[in-house]
Amino acid sequence: MKQIEVKKIVKAINASDGAGVKLKRSIGTPEADYIDPFLMLDEFGSDNKDDYVAGFPPHPHRGIETVTYMLAGDFEHISNCFNTSMRMRRKTCNIVIFIF
């Protein structure tokens, strides 16, 4: 098996996005701006509902792919584009490709 050398470990920084959702961002920071094609890699995890309840107002998804992997807990993803919702639970993965 080929060994891969770790060149750099990037520490996630506290950030907020959308309507003030608190998160930790590791890709999409100035320290990791050389990583391509990723735009962002975020971790959401809080027991405080106020950290995430505001959500993300309508925003464009054209030409992107989202990957969501739930390590623990559950949440409901509501799409403003398609008027659909999906509940995710622990150890599930969701991949959505937006090509329109």
Could you say what each language-model-derived stretch is?
Residues 5-8, 31, 43, 65, ...:
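Glutamate identity and glutamate-enriched acidic tracts
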Residues 59-61, 77, 97:
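Histidine-centered active-site/metal-ligand motif
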Residues 1-24:
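Hydrophobic alpha-helical membrane-insertion signals
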Residues 16-71:
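A short glycine-rich, His/Asp/Glu-containing loop-to-beta-strand
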Residues 87-100:
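Conserved metal-binding segment of the jelly-roll/cupin
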Residues 53, 65-89:
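A short beta-strand-loop-beta hairpin characteristic of the jelly-roll/cupin
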